[in-house]
């Protein structure tokens, strides 16, 4: 067994930072209020550090949930897509009038997102809603930057919303569907190696923090 040291954290963070599509927007909105909860897990260091390196200067952690604890004492189930699980983060967000609430599950491979509506009530997005927003943003920026040339593709699983197909079709990006699991996604990516097709997605740097 080889234990990876902090230099691999640096490699990971640097690669993630290379994915930035709108540094000018971050600079303009650097002080937007973000509340983040790692749910007692692995995201406690890398997520705040990543946000800091992207340029966000006003990130507040939920203190009670910023302590690594495998018993997850402040939640019944550490699933950030459940409103009850996000309650402490949302309570803090209401207190500081946060613009965005983020939470990751203990191994930091799932994310919960909430934002205030016009009445100041925080709306929790589900995974499909978050995906469609991120996908639309990424493809919009790629189009603006001249990166879309008809040789890009995305991949969705059979449990993912069909809105992905609609967004891909709008941007004239091919959409593949596969069974649930990274191995099935990887198989499609592997099948395009050596071609001029380019995969668009987060899988390149997806990792448990």
What are these regions (language model features)?
Residues 1-85, 91-93:
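Gly/Ser/Thr-enriched, mixed-charge loops and adjacent short helices
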Residues 38-44, 108-110, 160-162:
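Gly/Ser/Thr-rich loops at beta-strand to alpha-helix junctions
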Residues 35, 99-103, 199-201:
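Short glycine-aspartate micro-motif
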Residues 1-7, 117-204:
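Proline/glycine-rich low-complexity loops and linkers
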Residues 205-209:
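Conserved small/polar residues in nucleotide/adenosyl-binding loops
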Residues 80-103, 153, 162, 177-187:
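Phosphate/diphosphate-binding loops
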Residues 45-50, 71-75, 111-117, 164-170, ...:
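Short acidic, glycine/serine/threonine-rich loops at helix termini
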